């Protein structure tokens, strides 16, 4: 259960379990279209030949890819390649912490990452994300479907306690994680409607991060363009796009999620993507979802079923 501290999430349990986490693999640079370099951790599938599934696993707000190491390692041990990038504006040494250059840059970076992997034609790319990373996974996957890119083919989307919208039915109104600067947000939104982006760099969102969880990698605030580029444009429309292109969706959420009402996630997703599989995992909270062995087990079972249903062999 969540602790009773002033923080939004149960960091006490999360940090107490940290010693049991898998060590993260090293960041490996990849080149982006603007000639900048970003980092990604790669977890190769276990076995001599490895599987054909490649999961792009995205971290949540304020964090970087390190806390996903245990989940990535378990999935790799189950025969899936996993790639966990540090999103632009995050990680150990971003060019500008908490900021990006323009609203679509995170999507472009993910396209560049997938292309940099130089995957074989029979590779199965699945985009997954935790929390705000889940929102970006949804946004990016829908954009790829709508653009009909011939060089990027997706085979599924996995949402782990995803952020959808601040007015989505599953959003807890009393969550203390995000600290919006409403006046700045309204000003930027109005200017953007007028085609003006001169203030897109200003900070509009802070995070309630306990001191013991902060380190040199922590990103404690977002600019307007990073916040806007990370969140789904229109989560209902994005889900409809995935359904239209018959892209399968798995959504997992912890029973004790402190940010979202777990029992309401299905009603957010299934009216727009009726085939979306939604599961509530007992005894798990928001942060624990990203480190629990049960999460890896449910993802692995779903990937195996998807592959079998489509007439292939697991992997």
Which residue stretches match the model-derived regions?
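An N-terminal hydrophobic leader/cap segment in hydrolases
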Residues: 1-32, 36-45
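The serine-hydrolase catalytic nucleophile loop
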Residues: 61-73
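Catalytic nucleophile-loop/oxyanion-hole region of alpha/beta-hydrolase
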Residues: 62-65, 91-117, 121
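Conserved alpha/beta-hydrolase
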Residues: 75-95
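Alpha/beta-hydrolase
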Residues: 185-241, 247
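Short beta-strand/loop motif that positions the catalytic acidic residue
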Residues: 245, 251-253
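Conserved alpha/beta-hydrolase "acid-adjacent" motif
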Residues: 258-264
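Catalytic histidine-centered segment of alpha/beta-hydrolase-like enzymes
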Residues: 284-294
């Amino acid at each position: 259960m969540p602790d009773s501290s002033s923080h939004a999430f149960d960091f006490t349990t999360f940090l107490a379990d940290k010693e049991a986490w898998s060590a993260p693999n090293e960041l490996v640079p990849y080149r982006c279209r603007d000639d900048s370099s970003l980092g990604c951790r790669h977890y190769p599938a276990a076995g001599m030949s490895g599987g054909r599934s490649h999961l792009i696993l995205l971290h949540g707000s304020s964090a970087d890819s390190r806390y996903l190491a245990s989940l990535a390692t378990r999935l790799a041990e189950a025969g899936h390649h996993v790639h966990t990038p540090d999103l632009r504006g995050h990680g150990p040494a971003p060019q500008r912490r908490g900021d990006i250059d323009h609203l679509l840059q995170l999507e472009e970076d993910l396209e560049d990452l997938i292309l940099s992997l130089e995957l074989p034609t029979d590779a199965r790319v699945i985009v997954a994300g935790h929390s705000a990373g889940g929102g970006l996974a949804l946004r990016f996957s829908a954009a790829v479907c709508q653009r009909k890119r011939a060089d990027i083919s997706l085979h599924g989307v996995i949402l782990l306690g995803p952020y959808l919208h601040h007015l989505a039915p599953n959003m807890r109104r009393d969550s203390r994680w995000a600290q919006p600067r409403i006046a700045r947000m309204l000003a930027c939104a109005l200017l953007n409607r007028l085609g003006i982006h001169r203030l897109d760099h200003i900070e509009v969102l802070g995070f309630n991060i306990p001191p013991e969880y902060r380190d040199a990698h922590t990103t404690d605030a977002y600019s307007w363009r990073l916040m806007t580029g990370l969140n789904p444009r229109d989560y209902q429309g994005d889900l409809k796009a995935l359904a239209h292109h018959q892209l399968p969706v798995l959504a997992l959420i912890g029973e004790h999620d402190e940010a979202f009402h777990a029992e309401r996630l299905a009603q957010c997703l299934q009216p727009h993507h009726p085939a979306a599989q939604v599961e509530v995992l007992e005894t798990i909270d928001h942060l624990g979802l990203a480190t629990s062995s049960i999460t890896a087990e449910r993802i692995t079972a779903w990937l195996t079923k998807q592959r079998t249903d489509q007439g292939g062999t697991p992997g």
